[in-house]
């Protein structure tokens, strides 16, 4: 299966997306992208230690604090913070990690792949959703 087909399959199967680095500021890209995904039926779990809630959902300080199954970890953090997030996703056995545009960390991506996790890197989940699931 091609990468675009795999992306479409992951987006079709996913129900719950944990968004690491989700901002409570509606002007930030993470907020707009996440609001779009929520409006298309995905359960959103904000992961940001600096907020209590976002988009009507309780926020958690880290992935390890999330009490439910996560289908996709969507990362809106600078690359230097990605490896810790990936390590937590591996620990939780999350099936997919999505690093947004300009979030590139080859070492962390390879570590996730070695753990059997599907990885998308340097792509916007909103743009891919629009392109693949019309």
Name what the model sees in each region.
Residues 89-112:
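ADP-ribose/adenylate-binding Rossmann-like module
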Residues 128-134:
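A charged, well-structured terminal subsegment
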Residues 23-28, 34-55:
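NAD(P)-binding Rossmann-fold cofactor-contacting core
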Residues 1-13:
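Short N-terminal or domain-adjacent regulatory/targeting segments
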Residues 1-3, 53-68, 72-84:
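Glycine-rich, highly charged phosphate/nucleotide-binding loops
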Residues 67, 106-127:
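Short acidic, glycine/proline-enriched helix-loop-strand junctions
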Residues 17-20:
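Conserved beta-strand elements of the Class I
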């Amino acid at each position: 299966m091609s990468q675009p087909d795999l992306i479409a399959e992951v987006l079709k199967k996913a129900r719950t997306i944990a968004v690491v680095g989700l901002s409570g500021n509606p002007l930030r890209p993470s907020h707009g992208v996440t609001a779009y995904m929520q409006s298309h039926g995905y359960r959103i779990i904000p992961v940001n230690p600096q907020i209590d809630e976002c988009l009507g959902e309780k926020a958690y300080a880290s992935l390890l604090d999330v009490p439910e199954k996560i289908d996709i970890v969507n990362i809106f953090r600078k690359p230097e913070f990605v490896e810790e997030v990936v390590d937590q996703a591996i620990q939780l056995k999350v099936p997919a990690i999505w690093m947004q545009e300009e979030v590139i960390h080859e070492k962390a991506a390879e570590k996730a792949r070695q753990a059997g996790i599907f990885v998308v890197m340097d792509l916007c989940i909103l743009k891919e959703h629009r392109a693949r699931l019309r």
